[in-house]
Amino acid sequence: MMRTHYCGSLTEAQIDQTVTLCGWVHRRRDHGGVIFLDMRDRDGLVQVVIDPDTPEAFATADKARSEYVLKITGRVRRRYEGTENPNMVSGQIEVLGKEIEVLAASETPPFPLNDDTINVSEEHRLKYRFLDIRRPEMLDRLRFRSKVTNLIRNYLDDHGFLDVETPILTRATPEGARDYLVPSRVQNGSFYALPQSPQLFKQLLMVGGIDRYYQIAKCFRDEDLRADRQPEFTQIDIETSFLNDDDIMDLMEGMTVKLFNDLLGVKFEKFRRMPYSEAMRDYASDKPDLRIPLKLVDVADLMQEVEFKVFAGPAKDPKGRIAALRVPGAGSLTRSQIDEYTKFVGIYGAKGLAYIKVNEIEKGIEGLQSPIVKFIEPIVMQLLERVGAENGDIVFFGADKAKIVNDAMGALRVKIGHDLNLATCEWAPLWVVDFPMFEEADDGKWTSVHHPFTLPKSSVEDVKSNPGEALSVAYDMVLNGTEVGGGSLRIYTLEMQKAIFEALGISDEEAEEKFSFLLNALRYGAPPHGGLAFGLDRLVMLMTGATSIRDVIAFPKTKTAECPLTQAPAPVEANQLRDLGIRLREQQKKEA
């Protein structure tokens, strides 16, 4: 063994023991002939002292610089009084170094690794990710991620789940995003697709009698990136037979409760279950952040007869919405602050942001401050009564197509809540249930809200006659406004699966071409089954307080799906393309 202990594991229990450490020089200080080295490894830091009484070790330490890899043997001793460091696990002790060996020298790193804050671009960090990972902050997050996956495996193993791998090279199926395609050399002109999820394979495992399955699976989606999206991501994928939706939610809730209790010391009460319709009505989001107590109120019925077209139009539009957002005590917002919120909702397509400041409600119209009061004077007091407005409040209004209002006012609710420190708790988990089975696309066709294998609450006949009214047996776990997991019961009869395909405009021929293996499996006695998939990256991001999932992934891609470290994606040799039967078409030069 090259070492006896990790640097960060040494405590007072090792005092007077001789130890051997291996690690990096985190920081070097020379104090009046005595050299101090803060040695760092995966588990943390320890202070090593080298004095001139060991001249060979002292000479080696004198040449060592930041990020040198050293092997040090020495005796653990208590630090002198007044020099302890309560912020370190090893802060009560130090190692008196006797022997030092340089295992590897280091050039000066392109950015400091020993600062608590790092002032360098993310792309530069990703280019030197092997160095960035050395930073204690990054090491802590990756260590935490490992603890999460280990706890999840143990929990699922204890509940009878089997870890089963599913294929990475499969065929393209419509799941909402673009597939990453892999050309086949053997089957020239044909392509594999990297899986967007193991959805169909885990259903086939249920048909095969596996009963309870899980997998920590790599998934791939060729879509535009955001702070919480990557082209390749990790899913905690779960499927089980002969359990209903309540059983599955209870099981997954128990796992989440254990995660937060064991790793963060956070105790959750029973998760609230909120219908999708309530979430959209009160919070304008299917993943509401319940830390923010603000709610939206529908007021379109009061606006139908007003002469103000901004309100009257959406009030009479079946696809429109007018929502009011009362912010208690925020009547002191300045015009410039309101202008900033107006710009903010514009990001979501809103054309403006109407408001009423309630100064002295007992004075009626005279006690209000607003550019819109004169247009809605006949109903303004009724409006304020409905939203529960009081003196000192401000009420914002969104009026447009329902989607624009929901996107804009839902985001505004959360932003104002954070800006004004209105959050009532640190964590707010819930289940959102009773999702619509379908939603209408711009072309008037039905599309799946989740995926076409979700079990509806409706009968086959009702799905065929009135798909727009069908609800699904689907459930999303939401935490602090982020969807961390989503699942459903699955269709397990051939008749229902064909009815769903029909509602989606998928012909029998297309269904057989793309899903013949699934349809065939449903002919041979599929059990009732369902499951859920957690986004591991997003879950760890929330639990560690990271601002991006790129900070909890060892080697992530940038927002443009590139890897600065390896320069992927990259061109390939012409002979490789030729073997695959692929020829690149030169882009036409732009005319001058």
UniProtKB/Swiss-Prot annotation:
Q: Which family is annotated?
A: Belongs to the class-II aminoacyl-tRNA synthetase family. Type 1 subfamily.
- Which gene carries the instructions for this protein? aspS
Q: Where is this site: Important for tRNA non-discrimination?
A: 31, 82
Q: Which Gene Ontology cellular component terms are annotated?
A: cytoplasm
Give me the segments passing through the membrane: none
EC?
6.1.1.23
Asked whether the UniProt record includes Glycoprotein among its keywords, one would answer no
Molecular-function GO terms, alphabetical? aspartate-tRNA ligase activity; aspartate-tRNA(Asn) ligase activity; ATP binding; nucleic acid binding
Instruction: Kindly list the places in or outside the cell where this protein is found, as annotated in its UniProt entry.
Output: Cytoplasm
Query: What enzyme category does the UniProt record give?
Result: ligase
Reaction(s) this enzyme catalyzes, per UniProt: tRNA(Asx) + L-aspartate + ATP = L-aspartyl-tRNA(Asx) + AMP + diphosphate
Q: What is this protein called?
A: Aspartate--tRNA(Asp/Asn) ligase
What's a BP term from Gene Ontology annotated to this protein?
Answer: aspartyl-tRNA aminoacylation
Its biological purpose is as follows: Aspartyl-tRNA synthetase with relaxed tRNA specificity since it is able to aspartylate not only its cognate tRNA(Asp) but also tRNA(Asn). Reaction proceeds in two steps: L-aspartate is first activated by ATP to form Asp-AMP and then transferred to the acceptor end of tRNA(Asp/Asn).
* CDD domains, sorted: AspRS_core, EcAspRS_like_N
What Gene3D superfamilies does the record tag this protein with? Bira Bifunctional Protein, Domain 2, GAD-like domain, Nucleic acid-binding proteins
User: Subunit details for this protein?
Assistant: Homodimer.
Natural source organism: Acinetobacter baumannii (strain SDF)
Entry keyword set: Aminoacyl-tRNA synthetase, ATP-binding, Cytoplasm, Ligase, Nucleotide-binding, Protein biosynthesis
Q: Which domain of life is it from?
A: Bacteria
